[in-house]
Amino acid sequence: MLRQWWLRSVGSCSTVYRAHSGCSTSAAVKPKRAIPTDGLQLSDFIKESTKKQRQKAIIPSIEDTKEYLNPEDLQGNGRTVCYVTYGCQMNVSDMEIVRSIMTKYGFVESDKKENADIVLLMTCSIRDGAEKKVWNQLKLIRSNSVNKGQIVGVLGCMAERVRHDLLEKRNLVNIVAGPDSYRDLPRLVAVAAGGSNGINVQLSLDETYADVQPIRVDSASKTAFISIMRGCDNMCTYCVVPFTRGRERSRPIESIVEEVQRLRDQGYKQVTLLGQNVNSYRDMTSMDFSMAPSTSQEDRVPGFKTVYKPKSGGLTFTTLLEKVADAAPDIRFRFTSPHPKDFPMQLIELIASRPNLCKQLHLPAQSGDDETLERMERGYTRDLYLRLVDDIRHVLPSVSLTSDFIAGFCGETEQAHQNTLSLIRAVRYSFCFVFPYSMRGKTRAHHRLTDDVPEDVKARRHLDLTTVFREEALKLNQALIGSEQTVLLEGKSKRDASFSHGRIDGGVKAVFDNSKLCLEPGQYAKILITDANSQTLKAQLIGQSSI
């Protein structure tokens, strides 16, 4: 656009110059070409240049700050850090990595935001409401702080998406660190302590934190998260994740198996494997490709499409799942969040063959309407999705399916909404994560589509989706009454300490009287389901059990 404007201007000026310089010309003098009313003016470029200069002044480069820091400046020396986490399980896992890095440098954890020397917030940008919570929390932290020199840092997706907005509010934020910059936090703290902004939001093509041993939030818990890959290549039009977390890259398979073995030796009983697109995992670092499929087509469900060139070679998610299941047969394994296209039959058959691979699959549909799915660029139709569900249930008859749905996406008609409701009734999910659509900057929807569904309509459709999924979940749970299930104890009931709660293999929460056997969290129990609502099972404890 700039080049086109410059050529128009130069062409006009040169014509006028010839006319006034006495140069002979047979052509008539052309009038200066007018700039379209919807085009860019010179003032637009001046404004943009001024904005970039202001941002450059606010945001120093890494090179500007490295040269005057000594190694001892990076040490915590007992300074306290309060960690605050918002958002998904991936953010919980990321904060465990941050804890490990900061602890290594001599920083000490504190649970008091108002007194801590440093407060680090792990943030989410998936919806506008998630960001508003962080902005409100930042104001509260500053207003309640009794530490005048307190340093506040914003980490994760929001740091990547609204970096400039954060640092322009210097009274609220001192550090901005993107998802691939956590190793740099000690330096960023040192920069902020010196009175400057500390920022690193550079996305990486290879950072996986594979060598960092996380410090987990709840040391008493027997469940853990393991991040196996980062980033996403799917580019769904509504989603900001590819822009805040970058391209897909996977940890070496050996590092994941080793972490599973450590957790096994520490007594953990459930591990959830995490990734933005977890079942597209592909380890390209290992020299052992003997178990890898020869073509990428074997890794995808037939008919499902991608917006990127499919990868081939390496060790796939199916191989990884087989290795971790064999490495820790007493640990239950779950995984999230997957994409429906990455559920080949080899994966489903493996899950069926291993008792410690939970028969609970998250299958994000987002919509049950073909036109809406096309605008979302999900790469499948309603019919393809339903065929996948049928194929899964053929191999795993008792599988528990969960899903994600967006209410009121761009251009969604009332008929499209009804199509989504009918999909929920047809599939019958155990649980659905349902949210009204929130347009995010940088996404393809932001550039190409119109957020044209009124907020009150989004709210009503959101309620419809929630109501229908709960009706179907109630039917599923009531069908379990009278059956025996294996449950992994997670803790005591908040209402009655004599009762314990845990989750069955399908992921549904169960509550039961544990006063006689007094089983501890991390132990397996056999229970008899006696009652149910849409989200919880009531049960009678039969006795201790195993997988």
From Swiss-Prot:
One of its GO terms (molecular function) is N6-isopentenyladenosine methylthiotransferase activity. [4Fe-4S] cluster 1 binds at C88, C124, C157. Its cofactor is [4Fe-4S] cluster. Signal peptide: none annotated. Residues 218-475 form the Radical SAM core domain. InterPro entries: Elp3/MiaA/NifB-like_rSAM, Methylthiotransferase, Methylthiotransferase_CS, Methylthiotransferase_N, Methylthiotransferase_N_sf, MiaB_methiolase, rSAM, rSAM_horseshoe. It comes from the Eukaryota. Keywords: 4Fe-4S, Iron, Iron-sulfur, Metal-binding, S-adenosyl-L-methionine. Binds 2 [4Fe-4S] clusters. One cluster is coordinated with 3 cysteines and an exchangeable S-adenosyl-L-methionine. One of its GO terms (biological process) is mitochondrial tRNA modification. The keyword S-adenosyl-L-methionine applies. Residues 79-194 form the MTTase N-terminal domain. SUPFAM superfamilies: Radical SAM enzymes (SSF102114). GO terms for cellular component: cytosol; mitochondrion. [4Fe-4S] cluster 2 binds at C232, C236, C239. The keyword S-adenosyl-L-methionine applies. Pfam families: Radical_SAM, TRAM, UPF0004. Residues 478-543 form the TRAM domain. NCBIfam families: MiaB/RimO family radical SAM methylthiotransferase. Belongs to the methylthiotransferase family. MiaB subfamily. Potential regulator of CDK5 activity. This is CDK5RAP1-like protein.
